[in-house]
């Protein structure tokens, strides 16, 4: 009798192990990219970087050229040292669909030059202000991948922290690029909840280039497409 019980226990253990292997094989990794617009802010961007560093995650920062200077240089260098990537959000934040071609080119080129000078990298991505974009802008600019993102409208200064959290977590999905702003304290506070909650839901939080790499999808240059998801 004891022998039978031992054999049955061994069989049960084996079946449980197989079931667990099958279960883990079926679990597909989930990824989401964090991105922040309109910085660097002397006050709030360092606070945001602190939150990212404390949680061990990286993000993509879309910088406005007129905010890039000797005073904000240490913040930009810290982004790079943390493994975050630094991208283009134009020089003065105009609607690119409503300005002359020469100004569009100047807005992008000036910011590219500043980012190269202060971050040591040439931006691959462009997030047009207000995500305003069309085929003409894409053709004119060329050589850039246009990035959109899922926004909780956190640019609104009066928006409660709880609403920023809820609007993000209720709509997040695998492969999403999340769009925030590192220009106000309420978003900094919201990230203290959003990041742990995303991790608890099984998401790995990455920068935008890493999201595309992990998805196996290569985004297109010279394309009118705006990427809000990697796949």
Question: What label would you give each PLM region?
Answer:
Residues 15-19:
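Sec/Tat signal peptide C-region and signal peptidase I cleavage site
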Residues 39-43, 70, 98, 102-105, ...:
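Soluble non-cytosolic domains of exported or imported proteins
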Residues 94-99, 154, 217:
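A short acidic, helix-capping loop that chelates divalent metal ions and anchors anionic groups
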Residues 122, 132-133, 137-171, 203-215:
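His/Asp/Glu-enriched short active-site or ligand-binding loop at hydrolase and phosphoryl-transfer sites
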Residues 21-27, 55, 68-69, 186-231:
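C-terminal domain-boundary segment and adjacent tail
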Residues 5-14:
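Bacterial N-terminal signal peptides
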Residues 32-35, 59-63, 85-90, 124-127, ...:
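Structural recognition of the beta-strand scaffold that forms the well-ordered cores
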Residues 20-97, 103-104, 110, 114, ...:
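Active-site beta->alpha N-cap acidic-glycine motif
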């Amino acid at each position: 009798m004891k022998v039978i019980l031992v054999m049955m226990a061994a069989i049960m253990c084996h079946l449980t192990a197989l079931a667990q292997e099958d279960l883990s094989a079926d679990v597909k990794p989930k990824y989401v990219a964090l991105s922040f617009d309109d910085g660097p802010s002397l006050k709030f961007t360092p606070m945001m970087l602190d939150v990212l560093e404390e949680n061990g995650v990286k993000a993509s920062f879309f910088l406005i050229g007129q905010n890039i200077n000797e005073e904000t240089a240490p913040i930009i260098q810290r982004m790079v040292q943390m493994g975050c990537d630094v991208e283009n959000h134009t020089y003065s934040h105009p609607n690119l669909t409503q300005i002359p071609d020469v100004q569009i080119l100047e807005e992008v080129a000036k910011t590219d030059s500043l980012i190269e000078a202060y971050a040591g990298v040439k931006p691959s991505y462009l997030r047009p202000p207000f995500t305003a974009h069309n085929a003409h802008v894409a053709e004119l600019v060329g050589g850039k991948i246009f990035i959109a993102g899922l926004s909780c409208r956190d640019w609104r200064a009066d928006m409660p922290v709880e609403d920023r959290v809820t609007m993000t977590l209720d709509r997040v999905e695998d492969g999403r690029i999340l769009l925030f702003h590192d220009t106000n304290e309420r978003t900094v506070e919201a990230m203290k909840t959003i990041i742990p909650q995303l991790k608890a839901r099984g998401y790995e939080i990455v920068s935008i280039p890493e999201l595309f790499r992990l998805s196996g999808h290569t985004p297109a240059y010279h394309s009118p497409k705006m990427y809000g998801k990697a796949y």
